[in-house]
Structure formats: structure tokens, C-alpha cells
């Protein structure tokens, strides 16, 4: 597995975001937590503050093999409202790249007509 980006939004479920990053790093996967905010700071669904590695605009998605969308109701809403996240999801689908979505996040793929049914 090459490079993985986990999208981080305010209101995301901390365990769904950070556990993915932790497990992949333990498996020696190059994984990056990318904030969709203008800053690295994230405030999770349970009021836990943590920092991303980079912001969304710092990522060259041509070099990324997989994206991960964590759940959390507010986090899902923030990811869905971010035009860049939606565009990357659509681009990954067209390029047959990996997309993982947890909990409430698959609805982002449905809203963008990536999933049907």
C-alpha cells in the first residue's frame, strides 16, 4: 500500500480517525492526517482537540493511493460541505483508487453519486 490520507474535520469521531492512522502506521503504511480546516487544529466529536499533519491544500492527491473518510455526524457534515473533499472523492472513483468511509461517512459518497442504492 502506498500513501493514505485520512480527512480530518471538526466533529469527526476521534476513534474512527485516529485508530485508522495508528493501525496503518504500525503496519508501516505512509498515512497522513489532513485537516480540512485552514489550520492543523481539529476538535473532535467528543471535544478532544488534536492536530493534523497537514492541511487539505498541502496534499498532492496524484501521489495518494487511498483516502479515508471518518464518521461522526458533524464531521460528516463538514466533509460533505468541503468542495475539495467531494471533488477528490469523485476523482478517486473515476481513477479506480481506494476510498474508505466509516460510520456516517458513506453518505458523503452517496450524496456525490459515488455509491448507488
Segments predicted by a language model, with ranges:
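Extended, subdomain-level signal for the structured scaffold at the beginning of enzyme domains
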Residues: 1-95, 108-117
Amino acid at each position: 500500500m502506498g500513501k493514505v490520507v485520512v480527512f480530518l474535520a471538526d466533529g469527526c469521531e476521534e476513534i474512527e480517525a485516529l485508530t485508522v492512522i495508528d493501525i496503518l502506521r504500525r503496519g508501516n503504511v505512509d498515512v497522513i492526517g489532513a485537516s480540512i480546516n485552514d489550520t492543523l487544529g481539529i476538535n473532535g466529536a467528543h471535544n478532544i482537540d488534536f492536530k493534523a499533519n497537514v492541511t487539505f491544500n498541502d496534499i498532492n492527491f496524484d501521489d495518494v493511493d487511498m483516502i479515508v473518510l471518518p464518521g461522526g455526524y458533524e464531521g460528516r457534515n463538514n466533509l460533505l460541505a468541503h468542495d475539495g473533499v467531494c471533488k477528490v472523492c469523485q476523482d478517486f472513483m473515476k481513477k479506480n483508487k481506494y476510498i474508505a468511509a466509516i460510520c456516517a461517512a458513506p453518505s458523503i459518497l452517496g450524496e456525490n453519486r459515488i455509491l448507488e442504492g
